[in-house]
Every structure is written in structure tokens, then in C-alpha cells.
Amino acid sequence: MARTKVHVRKGDTVLVITGKNAGKKGKVISVIPAKSRVVVEGVNVVKRHTKPTRKMPQGGIVEKEAPIHSSNVMLFCGKCNSPTRVGKKFLEDGEKVRVCKRCGETI
């Protein structure tokens, strides 16, 4: 299976643009490039029934975030305070950075 590129990284603030969680904003917890999915904090929360373990002797029902497809999220720019597409630019020292397509600010 070919590895696909995902337009967001761990730690980015994103806005969910489609689905049952549309309009919610959160921080990316993890990225799964092989499946083009991201896990966003507070978005797509599901309940999982867990058996008692040494780590969690009580067991029971645990709420956790499930992954959503990366095409359903858009990077959120803090400067222009809106969702935006991502562009890439080279600085004078040759470093490659991501920039906001709306305001041109480095992300």
C-alpha cells in the first residue's frame, strides 16, 4: 500500500468541515498517513467497552476519540482566525515552511 501525504500534522489546530462534527475545532492528537486519517481532540468521541486490566482494574465504558478522514478537516489559521488551505514557501536560508493561503502568515 502506497503511503499518502496528509496536509495536517500532529499539534495543528483544525476545523471539521463535514460530517456529524462539522464546525468543531480541535487539536490534532495523531496522524495515520497509511489510511489518510487524523485523530482530533474532542471530535468523533466514541464509547469503548473495556475489560479490567492491570492498568485499569475497574474496566467499564471509556470515551475516546476515533479517527476521521483527513479530507474532512481544514487547517485553522490563528492570525486570520479562519480555516485555510496550506501553501509551501522557501525562506532565505533555504528552510521550507507552511504558509496560510489567506493571509500569507507562516504556520
From Swiss-Prot:
One of its GO terms (cellular component) is ribonucleoprotein complex. The gene is rplX. Keywords: Ribonucleoprotein, Ribosomal protein, RNA-binding, rRNA-binding. CDD domains: KOW_RPL26. Part of the 50S ribosomal subunit. SUPFAM superfamilies: Translation proteins SH3-like domain. One of two assembly initiator proteins, it binds directly to the 5'-end of the 23S rRNA, where it nucleates assembly of the 50S subunit. One of the proteins that surrounds the polypeptide exit tunnel on the outside of the subunit. It holds the Pfam family ribosomal_L24. Signal peptide: none annotated. The keyword Methyltransferase does not apply. GO terms for biological process: translation. It comes from the Bacteria. Belongs to the universal ribosomal protein uL24 family. It comes from Pelotomaculum thermopropionicum (strain DSM 13744 / JCM 10971 / SI). PANTHER family: MITOCHONDRIAL RIBOSOMAL PROTEIN L24. This is Large ribosomal subunit protein uL24. One of its GO terms (molecular function) is rRNA binding. InterPro entries: KOW (IPR005824), Rib_uL2_dom2 (IPR014722), Ribosomal_uL24 (IPR003256), Ribosomal_uL24_CS (IPR005825), Ribosomal_uL24_KOW (IPR041988), Translation_prot_SH3-like_sf (IPR008991).
